[in-house]
Amino acid sequence: MTYIENIFLCMVSPLLVAALCMGRRQLRFFLFCIAGMGVCLLSAYINTFLAAVCQADALAATVEIAPVVEEMMKLLPLVFYLLVFEPEGDKIKAAAITVALAFATFENVCYLIQNGADRFSFIFFRGFGTGAVHVLCGLIVGGGLAYTWQRTWLKIAGTCGLLGAAITLHAIYNLLIAYGGAAQYVAYALPVLLVAAGKLSAFRLSQRK
């Protein structure tokens, strides 16, 4: 049995100390890191609870429950940030990526502790794939929120649409992982390639301007 709350405390403790030492300018980054790990911890409990209530098998829990719960939980700190502080667009995107990155990091650490780290090649691809899919979902949601929350009539519909897009992408990723075999490695490579393609497109657009 993996006591993920103990892992959470061990990972959050140095972040809290660093947040106190770095001052107010860097405080937001550390708080969103802690929030990302916190919602990952809560997502694990909620996933387990819903899987038990719905009597879902491993595939259903992975493809139907986990993507919905995890993406909704990652959205909560961002919505709170938007409602309370009304930040600028760049800050929204940075916050979304930080939450997603911390979520993926905590998830990977828990996976390593539970399953071992003896298979380097598999762990290498999984680390990049899981990190990239969460960051990609964070980019979709963060970039979209920066646009939709500047327009009152788009706030609710836009947020729901972005959440749906992130859930769909996450569910496809989990489905390929659950299928196994070559599809598993396609899933690991796909988000990395999408992030790289997005950055390349953004770079070319900036060069044209």
Task: Give the positions of each predicted feature.
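Hydrophobic alpha-helical segments at protein termini of multi-pass membrane proteins
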Residues: 1-209
